[in-house]
Amino acid sequence: MNQLNSETVRWIKSKPLFLVALLVLVAGLVGWLLQGGQTQQTATQWPAPLAQLKPDFEVTQPLPAQLKLDGDKVALGARLFSDVRLSLDDTISCASCHVLSAGGTDNRYRSVGVNGGVGSVNAPTVLNSGFNFVQFWDGRAASLEAQVEGPVNHPKEMAANWPLVLSKLGKDAAYAAAFSKLYADGITATNIKDVIATFERSLITPNSRFDKFLQGNAAALTAPEKHGYELFQTYGCASCHQGVNLGGNMFEKMGLMGDYFADRGNVTEADNGRFNVNHNPESLHEFRVPSLRNVALTAPYFHDGNAATLEEAIAVMAKYQLGRAMPAKDLNDIAAFLRSLTGELAGQPL
């Protein structure tokens, strides 16, 4: 991984060492316990003075500038991502609910599909989704390829099926030529899923101001943003939101320190979360922790879209995940830090 640059290390060193050490140890222990004693990331090398601590999760690190992907697959996947012929009535594409210029979501409480069908959860961002350890809020898809399967067949999303999709795309000479160039068997459901997933893996958003800070530019963040990052760690947010994607690498129960669903009301089957997949009572109300990359652009928040603003989402997390009220200044500084996580897509600021 990329080590933190010397300027950032000096900023960390300016904080009391005992506090830094304590925070890292507590965050590591909490993250370990919440994952059932199993880590999903390996220990890594930290800069002094943290190297000797060897925490069980990777330090937050900048996104890579690019990944090594097949350019032809990326280009073909991009075309299909915006192709409405993947839907029953040629009205909905992947891009309908995952608007790349809007943070990879549609900024709706619920997405609307074919014939006005309304989904049961808030659409998660597609940006940086290749770094998630599973896909969907409930983690029912183990890969991006498996994720592509869901919307195509879902009656409230694209409401199609693969024979129909293959029939429509097979009549497109340009698609036929492009697939034949890449695959001996041409246009198949498996190959469509492969190119779309490859395109989705290319949707990384590096060069946020926070990335630049991690790379050594201590001036990339303002004083409130630096304080917000410090609070993000001291409050324990980093126990779940860490790694290169600041999330996306574990499940967590919604409402650790309070009954979120009883207070919100109108509980639905989708609120069961991971339980709907594995039917394990211990997984009730567990969801994949979302990435915080570009989070300022992806309102409304949570699987239910119930928080309209970033500040509201932070307050909800403080109450139901941490069991405490957060002073307004702390909340605002954490929000300022989170807004520094907005990056670039294909070299253009989001």
What are these regions (language model features)?
Residues 39-150, 211-316, 322-324, 349-350:
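Short glycine/threonine-rich turn/loop motifs
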Residues 2-74, 132, 150-226, 230, ...:
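Post-cleavage N-terminal segment of exported redox proteins
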